[in-house]
Amino acid sequence: MPVLCLIRHGESLWNKENRFTGWVDVPLTDKGREQAKRAGEILKSLNIKFDIAYTSLLSRAIETLEIIIKTLGYNIPVIKDISLNERHYGDLQGLNKDKVAEIYGKEQVRLWRRSLKVRPPNGESLEDTQKRTIPFFERAIKGDLELNKNVLVVAHGNSLRSIVSYIENLNEEQILNLEIEPAVPILYDYDINSKKFYNKRILKI
């Protein structure tokens, strides 16, 4: 049975500063690099051989993947695609989340960050993000799983939320409460015959 592994990048500089990041290209912190290394160590302990890896065009995801591959100790073909970029936070990008909450209220910020359909000003909703992530997921990532390949995906909180909510067929309330932690591997087995994902594992240690 092929395996799909989803991993959010490690802590970035703007994660540490509690700022909306979106498509702004900011680096990992030292903590983020350590988180990525730990994710690689966890995967190495499982003895899963990944056949292909996918990531976004943003350096925090790319570097996380590079650290994981180095820790695994073998080469994996890597495909980088804009479809896996974080959702675009529009006018919120670069702003401190607490300060935005002081202006607009915590509930409005929660809806901007976690709901399916509410867009931040001049930005993408999660539903908008799904319109680019899911076709790519179906075509490329699921296409590789259909070929019995083990697939590693390193991306972003919301690009991965869009994929997880699709895989698990979550409703809007479940999506609102869905969190993806930095550098914590999420694994699914994929049944080629039934076309279904099952046996979800979140490998937090």
Predicted feature residues:
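Short coil-to-beta-strand
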Residues: 2-11, 106-110
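Short, well-ordered beta-to-alpha junction loops that form the rim of enzyme active sites
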Residues: 55-58, 83, 114, 149-150, ...
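Short, solvent-exposed aromatic-acidic interface loops
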Residues: 200-205
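Short linear capping/connector segments at secondary-structure termini
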Residues: 19-22, 81-85, 114-118
